[in-house]
Amino acid sequence: MAGILDLLNSDLGKQIVSGVAGSTGTDSSKTSSVLTMALPVLMKAMERNAATPEGAQSLQNALENKHDGSILDNLGGLFGGGVDDSVKQDGAGILSHILGDKQQGVEQVIGQKAGLDAGSVANILKVAAPLVMGMLGKQKKEQNVSSSGDLTGLLGGLLGGSSASNDQSFLEKILDADGDGSVIDDVAGMFLGGDKKSSGGGIGGMLGGMFGK
């Protein structure tokens, strides 16, 4: 199964990056940086939420109804006349539900690394969140995922499946960030390959390679 960053680098993903950048007035490369960091974090947060029966059922319902992937069928129309406020409101609701009280810390950490303020990161994620849910809904349909257990497996697969635990630890660290400088420094070290353990593959290695200069 393709990982979430593979999907982001596909033709569909590039179209999403371009559209989100245009609709938020943000440079495409910075938008790509934000999404490259944010998408695994959102997947990890959803995996956390889906660990409970209630959380899994809630996500299952969302993917079967509103977020079934159909939003991806007409991206030209979605971005053509400017993204509708209802899409942004939907995105804000998704982020609040997925990240809860972790949202501000996540946006601060990603903003620090992408060279954007947290408000700009929030605007990017509001537009991107319904599309991310659409990508997940599309994968759910293609993989014929019907049970909560299968859904957890789908999320794990998008995160890299059997990645070593240290490859996932930086996702936990971002989710638990509160804007504290030391946390941001720790996460920056992981993204930039300063954490040697995360440079050997999996998400940590992929991100280290993308952001290492």
Which residues make up each language-model segment?
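A structural "flexibility-hinge" signal
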Residues: M1-K213
